[in-house]
Amino acid sequence: MLTKRIIPCLDIKEGRVVKGTNFVELRDAGDPVELSKIYNEQGADELVFLDITASFEKRDIIIDVVKRTAEQVFIPLTVGGGIKTVDDFRKILRAGADKISINTSAVKTPDLIKEASEIFGTQCVVVAMDVKRKYITDSQDENLKNKNIFETKLGSCWFEVYIYGGREGTGIDAIEWAKKVEYLGAGEILLTSMDADGTKDGYDLVLTKAISENTKLPIIASGGCGNANHVVDAFTEGKADAALMASILHYRECTVNDLKKEVEKNNIPVRF
């Protein structure tokens, strides 16, 4: 089994780290550069830095914060938010990022995945997917014909891809989109459950497992981490390659090292 990764996530709004629940009710969690330094020292494998309002507000990503973070951090840094072109990729990589995460722009312009992977390499291109369960009320609905249906404790559902920071549904089935981004040249998928986001009730394991089993790409599970057992579940039941978390680290409920120790106890390889 390959070494599993623990990745703190820094959601940035107006230059500050914020955290919310189900993509709303945002509250301040600190300075991105200072938090990055802390997680670097705690043994994080990577960091994900997302400017969560950039795509929606049509605002360029904050290059200055990326530069200052990259100067302090010596682990891989993935940066996303408002990145629409190959030139945007180039600017962020020059600022110090190792990988670029795209979501809205990938859906709107799928060729960007192909173009960026050809220029910068597949390892640079992370496709972020914000996904929400769509419960089925009418099994005869014509719109369900091309959807992958899953049974959950709360009923049958399919998984819909959302864009603009979770504000707009696309009607796209998450399983089919994952297959397409793999075909187009993405190197990794950052998979966020909008239903689980910020709840601390655990990752959406049905979703994570479904995407993991339908693509060969590494999957970063995101949304819902409340304790170390949730991370273990993401790796075992969800078959994820990495686990992303925010609240439990930002509010000092545990450290990266605490999480890794618990994961290792379950015979899952991690890097210390």
UniProtKB/Swiss-Prot annotation:
One of its GO terms (cellular component) is cytoplasm. The keyword Lyase applies. Keywords: Amino-acid biosynthesis, Cytoplasm, Histidine biosynthesis, Lyase. It is found in: Cytoplasm. Its EC number is 4.3.2.10. Pfam families: His_biosynth. It comes from the Archaea. InterPro entries: Aldolase_TIM, His_biosynth, HisF, IGPS_HisA/HisF, RibuloseP-bd_barrel. Coiled coil: none annotated. Its main location: cytoplasm. One of its GO terms (biological process) is L-histidine biosynthetic process. GO terms for molecular function: imidazoleglycerol-phosphate synthase activity; lyase activity. It catalyses: 5-[(5-phospho-1-deoxy-D-ribulos-1-ylimino)methylamino]-1-(5-phospho-beta-D-ribosyl)imidazole-4-carboxamide + L-glutamine = D-erythro-1-(imidazol-4-yl)glycerol 3-phosphate + 5-amino-1-(5-phospho-beta-D-ribosyl)imidazole-4-carboxamide + L-glutamate + H(+). CDD domains: HisF (cd04731). Pathway: Amino-acid biosynthesis; L-histidine biosynthesis; L-histidine from 5-phospho-alpha-D-ribose 1-diphosphate: step 5/9. The active site is at D11, D130. Belongs to the HisA/HisF family. Heterodimer of HisH and HisF. IGPS catalyzes the conversion of PRFAR and glutamine to IGP, AICAR and glutamate. The HisF subunit catalyzes the cyclization activity that produces IGP and AICAR from PRFAR using the ammonia provided by the HisH subunit. This is Imidazole glycerol phosphate synthase subunit HisF. It comes from Methanococcus maripaludis (strain DSM 14266 / JCM 13030 / NBRC 101832 / S2 / LL).
